Amino acid sequence: MTKAFDSALRLLSRREYSAMELCDKLKQKGFNLHDVQNALNECKRLGYQSDERYVESYIRARIHQGYGPLKIRQELKNKGIDPDLIQSVLHQEKDNWVNYALRAWEKKFKRQDDFSYSEMQKQHRFLLYRGFDRDVISKVFKEVKSSYLI
């Protein structure tokens, strides 16, 4: 085995990396492109590196942190992940986005008793910034209004 492959294994033993991230890390360590590609191909062949596994774990972590599909999709695209792969994994969660957005709202605003127009706008912007689309946000506010009798 090569030094690039050994270095890739050490990196992958700590956490999942996308193929592009792993390639960048190995290049930063001073390995030439040919060795990096060989190490990356060997890691994929042996199942040590998988973009699918990376996407699933990344999405799970970001959902847990209160982020929505738009922000997650953009972050993964910036990490060099195939958009079709991103879409297929995000699609598996499509029925849960309202619950995830409601959980993010509750974490930030649960103890809030001010439901003025400006406060609702602030809450709307917060959910938009977190990556939830307008349809999901409107469903969250319908739920909030019904449960808090606004």
UniProtKB/Swiss-Prot annotation:
One annotated GO biological process: regulation of DNA repair
CC annotations in GO: cytoplasm
InterPro entries: RecX_HTH_1st, RecX_HTH_2nd, RecX_HTH_3rd, Regulatory_RecX, WH-like_DNA-bd_sf
Gene3D superfamilies, sorted: Winged helix-like DNA-binding domain superfamily/Winged helix DNA-binding domain
One Pfam family per UniProt: RecX_HTH1
Top-level taxon of the source organism: Bacteria
The entry's keywords: Cytoplasm
Location of the protein in the cell: Cytoplasm
Function: Modulates RecA activity.
Family statement: Belongs to the RecX family.
Alphabetized NCBIfam families for the sequence: PRK00117.3-3
Protein name per Swiss-Prot or TrEMBL: Regulatory protein RecX
